[in-house]
Amino acid sequence: MSVEELKDTVHKLHERIQQLEKKVGVLPSSQPDFAKQLRLVLIGAPGSGKGTQSTDLKDKFCACHLATGDMLRSQVKQGTPLGLEAKKIMDQGGLVNDEIMIGMIKQELETNQDCKKGFILDGFPRTIPQAEKLDSMLKDRKTPLENAIELKIDDELLVDRITGRLVHPASGRSYHKIFSPPKKEMTDDITGEPLVQRSDDNEAALKKRLVTYHAQTEPIVEYYKKTGIWQGIDASQKPAKVWKDILKCLGQ
């Protein structure tokens, strides 16, 4: 068989494979399979374990972790159009509006390669209008939310957790001085970079944040219960058990 005949045979085989893929509904590898994406909102009070579980979810599902606070700081630092608009509002003491936040999430979904296999939203939405605008944007992209998982834990337990929390700023990995210490004191296990304790990780600041959190979150939980995608998990358990429960919620 000549080289040209071999090429022709390979070409015909490739065409035949594509025909068979279409018959059984297999998408070409160049197209994202939206049906298999992780599309999740993670709900939880400060210290409930969202950061820890988001990192594990990101690694397991090769999805992107969209922490809106981090996104906002990144956009401002990079000087993007949305970041500049947000900075102008913040410099005047205002709150960044929903349109800018939705725009940042949409931009991240469209440009971040890690988001091709799904996303974990952390810290957003916080109000019913935000949830409605998020749903509208995601439905327009044909990537509606599949799950809203709430990490439930008593406020009293959160105080012990949060006051000993240590964070690796670049990745969001979190540790605890007592319950989950790093291998080397004040040092990230993966990168060897220093850990920090956030200035607002103290009891007085936490109690103020919890009042705001509960006022905002209860309506959001009810919203997602009505849509049928909400599930609650006991976050007072050990992280490994919480992780197993999350996987059960995701059908794993």
Swiss-Prot record:
**Region spans: LID:** 164-201
User: Which Pfam families does the protein's record reference?
Assistant: ADK, ADK_lid
Q: Give the GO molecular function terms.
A: adenylate kinase activity; AMP binding; ATP binding; DNA replication origin binding
- Asked whether the keyword Endoplasmic reticulum is assigned, the reply is no
- Matches recorded under HAMAP family: Adenylate_kinase_Adk, Adenylate_kinase_AK2
| SUPFAM superfamilies from the UniProt entry | P-loop containing nucleoside triphosphate hydrolases
Q: How does it assemble?
A: Monomer.
Q: Name one GO cellular component term.
A: mitochondrial intermembrane space
User: Is Lipid biosynthesis set as a keyword in this record?
Assistant: no
Q: Which residues bind AMP?
A: 68, 73, 94-96, 123-126, 130, 198, 209
UniProt keywords, alphabetically: ATP-binding, Cytoplasm, Kinase, Mitochondrion, Nucleotide-binding, Transferase
Q: Where is this region: NMP?
A: 67-96
Q: What is this protein called?
A: Adenylate kinase
